[in-house]
């Protein structure tokens, strides 16, 4: 069964792509956060703020899963946000988070999220941010990155995932970042917990480590294919039949592979024909820069590019990374329905 998912937040209006308003509908389904500066400057209130945010965010994740789980089966896929637990890997807070009573409470409040996802058939994932660089040449950066990745593995473990290879399709997605390349990444992989190794998925990058590089680790972990990144990297509209795409499928060892999809921003490619795929070579010749073209669109404005993305839908689940979140995924789903 095809699945089409979105990332992290539920939007009710296109204006919310620029950030959720304080009085927005569904604040309870979206996460809250604070800053390390606020926590430092309000020491007497800091622990209570941490408790409030962790409880809100676990509850929000459950509500998100339940809402996605009430959608038609092909829409039951969502990425959960990384900012669930504030400062989990920060030196000033790491000991607090590792206290047994805190860990026990986290397991208690996150377990219902995983239970609901499995009951409702919702595929979940995480995506640590750009500072998670598992192939860095600097060992201190790698150690910090391991902490960050294991933070996501802890949340997945509390939700009941990680005991087997991508159980229920769960993945923790990260780029193969760092000048150490595949060799350094594989050394780092051996330092991760069994749950983290079971759930890690490596994504091709748009500027440096493309598909040909990530395939070097395909025998050791699942790969995520980001087709927008690949287009930025190579100018190619790769097909599902491409041998490289088939190797990505094989890396999942029977689990359903995941694909990331977006398109260059509509305010960059202004007046581009919505029924014609952009040609990267022509755009570069006209003075466009990859640094601008790589940015994710708000919505899936180019139907020709979406038609291409949908050629993968038979064998892949598609995660929409457009800033329009669920609203952008509505567009993808409707275009898919029109083809049925």
Question: Which role fits each region the language model picked out?
Answer:
Residues 142-222, 228:
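Eukaryote-skewed repeat-based solenoidal scaffolds used as protein-protein interaction platforms
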Residues 227-235:
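Short, acidic/turn-prone active-site loops that include or flank metal/cofactor-
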Residues 81-83, 124-129, 165-176:
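Core alpha/beta catalytic barrel or barrel-like domain that forms the active/cofactor pocket
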Residues 127, 226, 318:
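Conserved, mostly hydrophobic/aromatic
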Residues 1-123, 132-146, 150, 154, ...:
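Alpha/beta catalytic barrel-like cores
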């Amino acid at each position: 069964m095809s699945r089409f998912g979105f990332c992290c937040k539920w939007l009710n209006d296109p204006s919310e792509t620029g950030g959720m308003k304080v009085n927005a509908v569904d604040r309870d389904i979206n996460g809250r956060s604070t800053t390390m500066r606020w926590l430092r400057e309000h020491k007497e209130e800091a622990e209570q703020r941490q408790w409030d945010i962790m409880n809100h965010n676990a509850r929000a994740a459950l509500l998100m899963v339940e809402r996605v789980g009430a959608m038609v089966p092909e829409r039951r896929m969502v990425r959960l946000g990384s900012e669930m637990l504030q400062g989990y890997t920060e030196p000033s807070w790491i000991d607090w988070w590792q206290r047994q009573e805190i860990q026990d409470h986290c397991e208690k409040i996150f377990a219902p999220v995983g239970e609901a996802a499995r009951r409702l058939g919702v595929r979940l994932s995480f995506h640590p941010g750009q500072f998670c660089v598992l192939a860095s040449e600097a060992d201190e950066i790698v150690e910090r990155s391991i902490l960050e990745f294991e933070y996501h593995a802890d949340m997945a473990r509390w939700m009941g995932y990680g005991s087997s290879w991508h159980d229920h399709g769960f993945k923790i997605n990260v780029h193969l970042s760092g000048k150490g390349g595949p060799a350094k990444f594989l050394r780092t992989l051996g330092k991760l917990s069994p749950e983290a190794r079971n759930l890690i998925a490596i994504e091709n990058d748009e500027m440096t480590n493309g598909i040909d590089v990530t395939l070097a680790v395909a025998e050791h972990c699942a790969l995520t294919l980001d087709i927008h990144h690949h287009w930025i990297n190579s100018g190619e509209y790769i097909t599902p039949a491409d041998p490289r795409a088939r190797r990505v499928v094989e890396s999942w060892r029977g689990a359903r592979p995941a694909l990331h999809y977006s398109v260059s921003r509509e305010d960059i490619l202004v007046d581009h024909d919505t029924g014609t795929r952009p040609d990267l070579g022509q755009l570069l010749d006209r003075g466009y820069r990859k640094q601008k073209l790589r940015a994710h669109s708000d919505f899936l404005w180019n139907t020709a590019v979406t038609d291409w993305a949908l050629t993968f839908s038979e064998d892949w689940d598609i995660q929409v990374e457009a800033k329009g979140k669920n609203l952008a995924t509505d567009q993808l789903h409707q275009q898919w329905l029109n083809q049925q």
